């Protein structure tokens, strides 16, 4: 892979689903929606995705987070207008709370069918939507030190974005069930902690020779370098509101630039043992903003919210320079309000059907949450749809 290197520009990709206004279930109408966009807004940047119920908004390359977010804001408003025209709603969260994976249709693209042929059951489970943030990095020599340092902030970003507590009508007890689903694919999950670009090239050569890349197109690691000269974070759940997306993107942008400048100044970047990174990923997926995370190689721990608060202070001067000070401060607004996963649970519980966390609803196995009827989570879908609409 070539890595041209670039200034610390930013770009954002935002996946959203389409739901029926009456049933609140997913509907495979992405092609119809994009056709409407073609009519009304020719030249738009909305694209189809793996499933026929999904579209993705793609920002251009921008210098600042406000510019990239405004790009998405315009696209989202146009998309919502066209969705209204054809009678569907936009839904932005990590997973849908009650849709069944077996009912979903693939988009019409040969490579998608090939992926399903290879991944089978787990490939069909991918009813998931996320936010991808690209940040430019100056040279390939810096890429893997920066990615390894970013992995120490995996739980921070995941906890902020977590918005997928339910699956097929089940309260999973997790804050981000999307995280557990996506890592089942053979080329997904956490990247290996490569020491340099040469090791990354050797890895890709092995994947090419073994046919892995031929089957999947590329590696889909949670964080990865791209041919555009960027480092891409891919593990955040899609958020219910645009300002949340902006806060997460600002935090990511500031971190990458902060780490690159530390490298330029001759400092060694922080890393965690791979087993600590894996544990932090699980804790954030499970507990969201209530997670107690491992903060250093000595296995000290802190609440993820305390860590976020401290890092917002540390990154504040840089955020002023990068033009995203307000967006970074919204990290604290998100913490104070609570995560999307908690709001979805509260909406479902308010309508009387979602079990309280810790309730044993099937035998005495102690599993948190429990099985319930899909109607229990209609309120959560309504909350998600309404929150997105109001945030635009």
Curated annotation (Swiss-Prot):
UniProt enzyme class: ligase
Q: Which UniProt keywords apply?
A: ATP-binding, Ligase, Nucleotide-binding
The GO molecular function terms of this record are: ATP binding; glutamate-cysteine ligase activity
Keyword Ligase among UniProt keywords = yes
Q: Does the keyword Transcription regulation apply?
A: no
**Region called Disordered, residue ranges:** 347-367
Q: Quick one: signal sequence residues?
A: none
According to the UniProt entry, what is the EC number of this protein?
6.3.2.2
Gene3D superfamilies hit by this protein: 3.30.590.20
Question: Which domain of life, per UniProt?
Answer: Bacteria
Query: Could you tell me what this protein does?
Result: ATP-dependent carboxylate-amine ligase which exhibits weak glutamate--cysteine ligase activity.
Q: Name the family.
A: Belongs to the glutamate--cysteine ligase type 2 family. YbdK subfamily.
Name of this protein: Putative glutamate--cysteine ligase 2
Q: What's the source species for this entry?
A: Corynebacterium jeikeium (strain K411)
């Amino acid at each position: 892979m070539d890595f041209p290197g670039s200034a610390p520009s930013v770009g954002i990709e935002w996946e959203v689903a389409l739901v029926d206004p009456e049933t609140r279930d997913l509907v495979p109408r992405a092609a119809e929606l994009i056709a409407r966009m073609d009519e009304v807004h020719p030249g738009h940047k909305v694209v189809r995705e793996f499933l026929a119920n999904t579209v993705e908004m793609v920002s251009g390359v921008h210098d600042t987070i406000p510019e990239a977010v405004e790009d998405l804001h315009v696209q989202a408003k146009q998309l919502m207008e066209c969705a209204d025209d054809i009678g569907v709603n936009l839904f932005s969260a990590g997973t849908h709370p009650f849709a069944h994976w077996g009912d979903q249709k693939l988009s019409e693209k040969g490579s998608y069918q090939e992926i399903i042929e290879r991944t089978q059951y787990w490939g069909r489970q991918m009813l998931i939507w996320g936010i991808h943030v690209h940040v430019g990095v100056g040279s390939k020599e810096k890429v893997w030190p920066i990615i390894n340092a970013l992995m120490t902030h995996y739980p921070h970003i995941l906890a902020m974005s977590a918005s997928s507590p339910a699956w097929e009508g089940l309260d999973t007890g997790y804050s981000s069930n999307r995280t557990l689903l996506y890592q089942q694919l053979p080329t997904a999950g956490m990247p290996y902690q490569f020491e340099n670009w040469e090791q990354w090239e050797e890895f890709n050569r092995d994947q090419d020779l073994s046919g892995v890349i031929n089957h999947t197109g590329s590696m889909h690691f949670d964080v990865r370098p791209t041919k555009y000269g960027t480092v891409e974070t891919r593990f955040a759940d899609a958020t219910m509101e645009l300002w949340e997306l902006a806060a997460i993107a600002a935090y990511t942008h500031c971190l990458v630039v902060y780490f690159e400048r530390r490298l330029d100044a001759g400092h060694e970047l922080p890393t965690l043992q791979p087993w600590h990174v894996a544990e932090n990923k699980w804790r954030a997926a499970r507990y969201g903003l209530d997670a107690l995370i491992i903060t250093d190689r000595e296995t000290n721990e802190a609440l993820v919210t305390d860590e976020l608060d401290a890092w917002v202070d540390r990154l504040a001067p840089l955020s002023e320079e990068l033009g995203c000070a307000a967006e970074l401060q919204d990290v604290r607004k998100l913490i104070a309000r609570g995560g999307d996963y908690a709001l979805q649970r509260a909406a479902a519980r308010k309508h009387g059907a979602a079990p309280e966390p810790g309730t044993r609803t099937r035998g005495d196995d102690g599993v948190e949450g429990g099985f319930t009827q899909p109607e229990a989570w209609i309120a959560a879908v309504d909350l998600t749809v309404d929150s997105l609409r109001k945030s635009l």
